[in-house]
Amino acid sequence: LPPPFWAFAWAGGQGLARYVLDHTESVSGKRVVDFASGSGLVAIAAAKAGAATVLAADIDPWTETAVRMNAGLNGVDIGFTHADLIGRAIEADVLLAGDVFYDRAFADLLVPWFINLTDRGVSVLVGDPGRAYLPKQRLEALATYQVTVSRALEDSEVKKTTVWRFL
């Protein structure tokens, strides 16, 4: 089996979760999708911050069990889907995506989708620690955090992580 990279609290997800908890107005009372949810860290933060509904979305077959267990341990209700949402319209007010710009081909799929969602009125928030394929346009920096990370995953113990809003 490949390593469960989705199980780690990546810097982008940690920064995005912190932002949501610090700025509850970004999700409070809103329908939220946590895209590429992994273990559910950002989805849990959204639920704790008062989101009306939270849907965790991840195509990895192992993630659903982790999300459901972590949600239960945190006393929050989170829906889950394995559907590949890329390119599709979503029933949400906010899409959260932590640390998704690590691969060129993936970024090339995400950027037009995120722009399309934004143009349809969805607030797209992304947490990113300076990955190579983060787009350089149509972004507004909302907050920056110094995030402690695992040396098993990163080249340093702390990563500067920015939360961006697609414009």
Where are these regions (language model features)?
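S-adenosylmethionine-dependent methyltransferases
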Residues: 1-167
